[in-house]
Swiss-Prot record:
Record bears the keyword Ribonucleoprotein: no
Species assigned in the record: Bradyrhizobium sp. (strain ORS 278)
RNA-binding among keywords: no
Biased composition (Basic and acidic residues): 1-12
Protein name: ATP synthase subunit b 2
Gene from which this protein is expressed: atpF2
GO CC entries: plasma membrane; proton-transporting ATP synthase complex
Cell compartments where the protein resides: Cell inner membrane
GO MF: proton-transporting ATP synthase activity, rotational mechanism; proton-transporting ATPase activity, rotational mechanism
Record text on subunit structure and interactions: F-type ATPases have 2 components, F(1) - the catalytic core - and F(0) - the membrane proton channel. F(1) has five subunits: alpha(3), beta(3), gamma(1), delta(1), epsilon(1). F(0) has three main subunits: a(1), b(2) and c(10-14). The alpha and beta chains form an alternating ring which encloses part of the gamma chain. F(1) is attached to F(0) by a central stalk formed by the gamma and epsilon chains, while a peripheral stalk is formed by the delta and b chains.
A Pfam family recorded for this sequence: ATP-synt_B
Family: Belongs to the ATPase B chain family.
């Protein structure tokens, strides 16, 4: 058994040595061998040409179509946004115009109402002044008439009172003409 184990060790040693010699011997890693460079470059060129053809014929048109579709969508959205902006500006201008018209109309109605009320109140004031002036004139006439009536009654009452006073003081009744003359003189002095 010991021999077989030793042979195995010896065999492994020979196999390892031969593997190292093959790697060092001339069979190296193919990409680093100068003899295979032309075929590697040709394979690389063929691979890149194939990749270019596939990308340019298949992938790029799809990507380009997606980009074009997105650009058209963006342009459409921008156009729609501009249209909506223009519509909103037009609506805002129409609103401002209507608002200005409504304000002007309201101011005109207010001015017209103020003028009507001023004219109406002026007419009412004038009618009231005329009515009051007529009532005042009637009152003054009534007062003058009442005063004249009262004064004529006062003259008679004053004459009777003066005659009674003189009769009480002197015991004799004075002459009616004398008493009336004295009362008239007294009333003219106070009037």
């Amino acid at each position: 058994m010991a021999e077989s184990h030793g042979e195995a060790k010896g065999g492994e040693a020979k196999g390892t040595a031969s593997a190292h010699t093959e790697a060092e011997g001339g069979h190296g890693f193919p990409p680093f061998q100068k003899e295979t460079f032309p075929s590697q470059i040709a394979s690389l060129v063929i691979a890149f040409v194939a990749l270019y053809v596939i990308v340019s014929r298949v992938a790029l048109p799809k990507v380009g179509a997606v980009i074009d579709a997105r650009q058209k969508s963006i342009d459409g959205d921008l156009a729609e946004a501009q249209r909506l902006k223009d519509e909103s500006e037009a609506a805002m201008k129409a609103y401002e115009t209507e608002l200005a018209t409504a304000r002007a109309r309201a101011q005109a109605i207010g001015a017209e109402t103020r003028d009507k009320l001023a004219a109406s109140s002026e007419a009412e004031r004038k009618a009231l002044e005329d009515s009051l002036a007529a009532k005042l004139a009637a009152a003054e006439t009534s007062i003058a008439s009442t005063r004249a009536t009262a004064m004529s009654n006062v003259r008679g009452i004053a004459a009777d009172a003066a005659s009674a006073i003189v009769q009480q003081l002197t015991g004799k009744a004075p002459a009616a003409k004398t008493v009336e003359a004295a009362v008239d003189a007294s009333l003219k002095g106070t009037a």
